[in-house]
């Protein structure tokens, strides 16, 4: 039986069949793109994936998937419910083996899908407050009433997100500080969790990898369910999640 705040070492398509209908608020996942020869990088069949996603999501649930081309284009075209992209801009490029043939890749897309309008909590940034007074006469519309716009300085988010990649941090004790080659930064996952869910909601990550989505959920008081087929990554993710849970109990 699938329980909250747990991850499972099993095929996600089989595991999702055990999740009740309409019980998930958001899917936030970095699925395999199928662009490398790594054994963990086998792309999932879109038809079976969407069948399970739409079944387990609440009517206003949202699917948020990381991607790169050509995977991202195939993913968008696999369902009529693609809505928009975020762009995650990293601080360090990738693809150095092809640097003489094409530009380095410094971004990933984050695709958003939904059937009904989902939860959306804009993550404001703070700018300078301002007050604007428009003239009573404009070139395009002629004479009109004077308009005053007052802002407290809050800025709505734009669709480009700047977060340092998890693998861009200096290694500790001479070894790398990540446990998965495509590990995402916790702060980026926290941003997405805060944007698309509320406290107490349940997030599914069906390709849990290093456990970052679970860590973000724990930090932001959301529930999580995860699946990870690779036993090595599963064990490391479990250890990481337990350490975070133990840390949170201290406060």
Residues covered by each model-derived region:
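Core catalytic lobe of class I
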Residues: 1-226, 232-235
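Short, conserved SAM-binding/catalytic segment
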Residues: 1-2, 238-251
């Amino acid at each position: 039986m699938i329980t909250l705040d747990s991850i499972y070492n099993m095929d996600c398509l089989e595991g999702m069949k055990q999740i009740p209908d309409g019980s998930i608020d958001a899917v936030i996942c970095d699925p395999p793109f199928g662009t490398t020869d790594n054994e963990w990088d086998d792309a999932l069949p879109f038809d079976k994936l969407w069948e399970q996603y739409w079944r387990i999501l609440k009517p206003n649930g949202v699917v948020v998937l990381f991607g790169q081309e050509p995977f991202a284009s195939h993913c968008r075209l696999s369902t009529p419910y693609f809505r928009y992209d975020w762009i995650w801009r990293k601080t360090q490029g990738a693809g150095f083996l092809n640097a003489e043939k094409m530009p380095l890749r410094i971004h990933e897309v984050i695709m958003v899908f939904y059937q009904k309008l989902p939860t959306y909590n804009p993550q404001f940034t703070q700018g300078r407050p301002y007050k604007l007074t428009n003239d009573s006469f404009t070139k395009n519309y002629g004479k009109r009433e004077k308009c005053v716009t007052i802002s407290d300085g809050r800025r709505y988010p734009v669709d480009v997100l700047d977060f340092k990649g998890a693998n861009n941090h200096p290694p500790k004790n001479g070894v790398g500080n990540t446990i998965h080659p495509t590990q995402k930064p916790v702060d980026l996952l926290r941003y997405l969790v805060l944007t698309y869910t509320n406290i107490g909601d349940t997030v599914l990550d069906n390709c849990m990898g290093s456990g970052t989505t679970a860590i973000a959920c724990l930090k932001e008081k959301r529930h999580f369910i995860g699946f990870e087929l690779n036993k090595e990554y599963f064990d490391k993710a479990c250890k990481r999640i337990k350490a975070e849970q133990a840390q949170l109990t201290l406060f």
